[in-house]
Amino acid sequence: MSAPGGPLARLEARLTREWQRRGALAWALTPFACVFGLCAALRRTAYAQGWKQPMDVGVPVVVVGNVTVGGTGKTPTVIALVDALRAAGFTPGVVSRGYGANVKAPTAVTPASRAGAAGDEPLLIARRTGAPVWVCPDRVAAAQALRAAHPDVDVIVSDDGLQHYRLARTVELVVFDHRLGGNGFLLPAGPLREPLSRHRDATLVNDPYSGALPPWPDTYALALTPGAAWHLDQPALRRPLSQFAHERVLAAAGIGAPERFFATLRAAGLAPATRALPDHYAFADNPFVDDAFDAILITEKDAVKLGASWRDARLWVVPVEAALDPRLIALVVEKLRGRSPA
């Protein structure tokens, strides 16, 4: 993992900027985007035409993913969806790739797992929901292992995996942030893994700036709301964000879209200094040791990577709750109760 402000971080930042416009670099990369698009289309076609068969794991599957590169708010969406499905009478489990973890075989994730062995998002989901969570690059194998260990699970939520066509799914939810499809180009000329026209059952858009929705069918607003911050060393100690308004505050985030976290804090009335760390930043050491701030606000996803050896009394964790549209929940429940995996 690159250091904060290192070459990889600068490259990521430049690509993110370039992917929002159709500049010279984007046009120069379009031949490679055409090749990427052809390969992706062949994979989709292989499953759509029956040349390859998706694997039915015996229970309905809801995939929460995206067609763009980078963070869009999938993890809080998965957490909220698990809670909503449980409230509707289901017993959900979660599968994930376990990005960043050294996982080769299906592995159970518990609240006591380490982020390095489980992945930061799966660990956060396990801690927030209490649902069974299994990780493996082969999501079919993860789902099969989860069902064998938890036969009472009657629906599986896949954290990401929209392009993992081998896993049969009943519902596909695609999450966007305010950037939507950027410049509209496929990788590497743009941020798209698949065309914006790709079929899905519903689209969720998290736009903390305008709140506007694109004119796409079955599109719902996704609201991410911060809760009271809790102290990293003393989780029972909580403070409303408003209490940080008159302190010297640094907001730091090692997530796919750190600016979204910063915007959330600004919307809560704070004016923090900000530091964007590389996505999945490992926190091998304390990058804040030389910073003169009264408080440092970090994300839950970053907090799961900070073990007991961290002793920085300035660190506060800001939880984020996703509010799902009741109509979206009703749509998902209806599809789960009325259709088998396909």
From Swiss-Prot:
Q: Which GO terms label this protein's molecular function in UniProt? A: ATP binding; tetraacyldisaccharide 4'-kinase activity
Q: Name one Pfam family in it.
A: LpxK
Name a biological process GO annotation: lipopolysaccharide core region biosynthetic process
- What Enzyme Commission number(s) apply to this enzyme? 2.7.1.130
Q: Where does ATP bind?
A: T68, V69, G70, G71, T72, G73, K74, T75
Out of the domains of life, which is the source?
Bacteria
Q: What class of enzyme is it?
A: transferase
Q: Does the keyword field hold Transferase?
A: yes
Kindly list the GO CC terms recorded for this protein: plasma membrane
Q: In which pathway does it act?
A: Glycolipid biosynthesis; lipid IV(A) biosynthesis; lipid IV(A) from (3R)-3-hydroxytetradecanoyl-[acyl-carrier-protein] and UDP-N-acetyl-alpha-D-glucosamine: step 6/6
Keywords from UniProt, A to Z, are: ATP-binding, Kinase, Lipid A biosynthesis, Lipid biosynthesis, Lipid metabolism, Nucleotide-binding, Transferase
Q: Which reaction does it catalyse?
A: a lipid A disaccharide + ATP = a lipid IVA + ADP + H(+)
Which family, according to the similarity comment? Belongs to the LpxK family.
Physiological role: Transfers the gamma-phosphate of ATP to the 4'-position of a tetraacyldisaccharide 1-phosphate intermediate (termed DS-1-P) to form tetraacyldisaccharide 1,4'-bis-phosphate (lipid IVA).
Stated name of the protein: Tetraacyldisaccharide 4'-kinase
Q: Which organism is it from?
A: Burkholderia orbicola (strain MC0-3)
Gene designation? lpxK
